């Protein structure tokens, strides 16, 4: 027993198959040999956790590291119930030297990325409203560039194959019956007879023809612990108790029930234990971002021009954080035409390339 304890403290890596340390813990174990490096590494993580930038639903960035500026940055993501979050970076699988993690709003680590082929990838599926922070940090000795992507995806398939977001013409919460009730679903329009598919694997819990929904199907989905409601169908092609797979055709679009005076469409709803929830995030199709273009890069820049403002997102319409006129900036990376920058007082954001002048690390800023 004593030998085992001593071995753990002297050679903890021998017990990794039991303890299963995170990539960060393994790297910090190596850095204990050089305390000043360990202190720098930990301070960079804290710097990233203080970042306040918020990504869009489909975000990409070209990131680089330099000798004088190891990479560390934090990216907030607002996640709706029904969405999952993906974060990936391209890596050299021979010796990965990046840390990619997800933290909750209290700063608790909830997931560390795993190596997948030539990438480091996170996939977070919690099926609830939340705000997450993705942290990307390079090893101190890393001198490289990579493509970072952070994007959201719906948990379910779109219930009408061949159709997309623009086929949804009526959304959650719209007033019905003169305001006496609200719309508890999405109306997705298509020609009569268009296939309706199972949005997830599950079991058909009911097949009915009655009331406002007319011909309807209920599907019990274990993935999201919910019931899917398909209404106004022209035909039902499944039976109660039947098991179906994601993408199986279960019915055909129609206008039965109280939709008999409207154009044919599918009313798609989702019900959880507390009642109906907005189905839009569960099916809303979000494009996977393309790689961000690489812009000219130096470790430092200076803001210039009266329109030199830092924004929360890489968009002129996003929240303006502050002016950066004549401020010296650390250049972290770029999201297409926007530099990801950090000010001397550690505020991170985005500045358009037109208001950033790149400078040599030892040159004057004026």
Task: Give the location of each predicted region.
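SH3/SH3-like beta-barrel superfamily modules
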Residues: 129-135, 321-353
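A short macromolecule-binding patch
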Residues: 225-232, 346-357
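Zn2+-dependent peptidoglycan hydrolase active-site motif and core
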Residues: 199-237
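Surface-exposed, glycine-biased beta-strand/turn segments
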Residues: 127-215, 246, 255, 266, ...
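Acidic, Ser/Thr/Pro-rich low-complexity intrinsically disordered segments
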Residues: 4-9, 25-26, 66-119
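Short aromatic-glycine-enriched beta-strand elements
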Residues: 212-218, 264-266, 336-340
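Non-catalytic extracellular/lumenal accessory regions of secreted precursors
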Residues: 1-73, 151-177, 305
